[in-house]
Amino acid sequence: MAASTVWTILKGAGLDPAPRRSGPTWGQFLSAQADAILAVDFAHVDTVLLRRLYVLVVVEHGRRRVHLAGITAHPTGAWVTQQARNLLMELGDRADRFRFLIRDRDSMFAPPFDAVFAGADIRVIQTPGRAPRANAVAERFIGALRRECLDHLLIIGPRHLAAVLREYVRHYNGHRPHRSLDQRPPASGTPARSGAVVRPLRRDRLGGLIHEYVQVA
């Protein structure tokens, strides 16, 4: 990403670039602040009845934990703002650890949406136009969701989509390994002790579309 793009993003968020014009790159900023960053984005899903549904997802940069914020056929600024309130309620005391929220320039992210996060001392950073890589963590999740799940299923309607996404997000957070987390899932607990006698157990999800493997004594 060009230095001028990084400068625009940081300046728009009220973060003054270093006077010597050699401050951190966008990637360095994301790495340094990962545990304090949320990213939000929309995915769309077309049903077998040719109806388009919109999915609002939020990703915690540090742990790669995903939150399914909401599903609707008619996204509006008011709806998106309510999902922001719901997310902060879901996070509870954990919301205090976040300082930044990255979003694109979608018109659904209206000033009231930003105000919800501002009220929680979370600064909204708006990415430049036509720069999807600026919100790469959220984009990567949406890409994985399509490749691993949605591209293989025919979605009937909102209730069906909600059930599918809930199961996939449970798998993603609880079992899917991530390279940035040393091949552990976002919600991983304490790893098994070295030398313990264990055997793998396979669990099928989404009708066998996805396989999970757990260790049992």
Model-derived regions: residue spans:
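Charged DNA-binding/catalytic regions of mobile-element recombinases
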Residues: 1-217
